[in-house]
Amino acid sequence: MSNRHALLERIIAESQRHYAAYVLFNQAMADRLGLHPTDLQCVALLNLEKGPVSTGHIARLTGLTPGSASRLVDRLEKAGLAVREADPEDRRRSLVSLTPGMSERIGQAWETPGTAYGEVLRSYTDAELELIADYLRRATQVGLDQAERLTAGG
């Protein structure tokens, strides 16, 4: 087995371990905040958005059906995590955003794990960080593409 082949196998195995650890972490964080893991992911994704988004956009971000995304937004509203307002450009559509102060609450919840992840990242050079960022962006797109393929029955 070539060194490259062994390295690729190692990366695949470490990626699987990373994903499993992230799923466990996400569940623990959701439990700590009293949320369903999907709801936590939606809150985290909304926190990354530049402004309010449609329920349809949330469906695309989360991989949920439009109906499931609407029920997710209902739960977030009921929990006081998000607000739904009429779209000023299309009154038939609503836009969803985090409630004021929610970004700070997310930041507080992420303070300890964020510090731990930050310590890991600080051990890399700028060039290595660029490579890691590129890999994560590209791997994320592969994941999204494969989820779409599987959802479409492919």
For every predicted segment, state its role.
Residues 1-33:
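N-terminal leader segment of winged-helix/HTH proteins
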Residues 18-25, 62, 105, 109-120, ...:
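Alpha-helical linker/hinge and terminal dimerization helices associated
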Residues 3-6, 30, 105, 127, ...:
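A structural signal for alpha-helical segments
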